[in-house]
Amino acid sequence: MINEIKKDAQERMEKSVEALKNNLLKIRTGRAHPSLLSGISVEYYGAQTPLNQVANVVAEDSRTLAITVFDKELAGLVEKAIMMSDLGLNPMSAGTVIRVPLPPLTEERRKDLVKIVRGEAENGRVAIRNIRRDANGDVKALLKEKEISEDDDRRAQDEIQKLTDAAVKSIDEVLAVKEKELMEV
């Protein structure tokens, strides 16, 4: 019973860390990375379609993304979708290939992005603590129903705390890497 609670908590904590990593991928650093455009959708045959389903996105060099559109008619729509996004990018079209040069980040913008990244990391920590609270509540319920002893309760809470500490530590490591990436000129 306790092992199931711990396993569930650990899986949920790992998912929270992965979700944070995915959220941070969408925050632009100075380098071009295809995942930067992963949140962009294009109007295609009356439905919003993710960019990666209508085009191929690759990093041409450290400052340029190249988008190869599968359907030539979509080039204008893809270009418009990128301009309408809040990424502040100006795509240039050349037939079926759209090049997106990434302007260098200003110091002020870097600091703003670091604040955003820290906020995302804090949201991740809050999610981890909520998972800990849920797991501890489940263990307390077992104790209340006299299915486990107080010693088992204490031991389970200590183990859940260790899982929490490990998850928070990995969030802090992800945050440190992203901050370093952002502050590199």
Curated annotation (Swiss-Prot):
Keyword Disulfide bond annotated: no
Gene Ontology molecular functions: ribosomal large subunit binding
Record SUPFAM superfamilies: Ribosome recycling factor, RRF
A cellular-component GO term for this protein: cytosol
Stored Pfam families: RRF (PF01765)
Source taxon at top rank: Bacteria
Biological-process GO terms, alphabetical: cytoplasmic translational termination
Membrane-spanning segments: none
Keywords: Cytoplasm, Protein biosynthesis
Compartments it resides in: Cytoplasm
Task of the protein: Responsible for the release of ribosomes from messenger RNA at the termination of protein biosynthesis. May increase the efficiency of translation by recycling ribosomes from one round of translation to another.
Family stated for the protein in its record: Belongs to the RRF family.
Name under which the protein is recorded: Ribosome-recycling factor
Record organism: Aliivibrio fischeri (strain ATCC 700601 / ES114) (Vibrio fischeri)
Gene name of this polypeptide: frr
